[in-house]
Design a protein with these regions (language model features):
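Glycine-rich phosphate-binding "P-loop"
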Residues: 1-10
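Primarily the HKD phosphodiesterase
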Residues: 10-72, 172
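Short, acidic/turn-prone active-site loops that include or flank metal/cofactor-
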Residues: 58-59, 81-84, 100-102, 119-120
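Short, charged, surface-exposed secondary-structure boundary motifs
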Residues: 62-65, 86-87, 105-107
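Structural recognition of alpha->loop->beta junctions
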Residues: 66-86
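Short beta-strand scaffold segments in enzyme catalytic cores
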Residues: 86-89, 114
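Signature of lipid phosphatidyltransferase scaffolds
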Residues: 96, 101-172
Length: 172
């Protein structure tokens, strides 16, 4: 039977869903800014070679998140325009609710959600699974690149060299 989740319960069961995933884990959320605990759990699942799909809907993926995601070989990231859904699903269960995968939301917002277990809520779980599959299909897979960050770093280093040179050379 479905279980109602408040903010802390949603966070707790999201962590449990990630920990208990054995085959696949799909995380669908417009916003991505993972807290350290979720990162640690996803890194562990990556080491276990679990198929992880992350779908996000806001294009402003922060460089720190992009850099971190790039290190995970078994995580596929996709962008879905107009995404507002928040659904976290594994082979054993599903959470549907208001919680974004955004560190701020998990700490500061009042959230609600529903936990569905595949064994207890088979029909509803299958409907949610099918919709999550559809969202993944219509999403564009994103290959995370560090090009922009590297260009910014080079420009920044060039500026630092100019400043150092300016301060080291005697004035004319």
């Amino acid at each position: 039977m479905a279980k109602f989740l408040n903010t802390s319960a949603t966070t707790y069961y999201l962590e449990e869903l990630i920990k208990q995933a054995k085959e696949r884990l799909w995380l669908i959320s417009p916003y991505l800014k993972f807290n350290d605990r979720i990162k640690e759990l996803l890194e562990d699942k990556n080491r276990m070679k679990i198929d992880i799909r992350i779908v996000y809907g806001k294009s402003e993926l922060q460089p720190a998140e992009a850099n971190w995601l790039k290190t995970l070989d078994y995580v596929r990231t996709s962008y879905c325009a107009n995404l507002h859904a928040k659904c976290y699903i594994s082979e054993g269960g599903c959470i549907i609710g208001s919680l974004n995968l955004y560190e701020f939301s998990q700490i500061n917002n009042n959230e609600m959600g529903i936990l569905l277990l595949r064994r207890d809520d088979t029909a509803v779980y299958q409907d949610a699974y099918a919709e999550a599959q559809r969202i993944i299909r219509i999403s564009e897979e994103v290959k995370i690149s560090l090009d922009v960050v590297e260009k910014q770093l080079k420009a920044s280093q060039k500026g630092i060299r100019k400043n150092i040179t300016r301060h080291l050379l005697p004035p004319n």
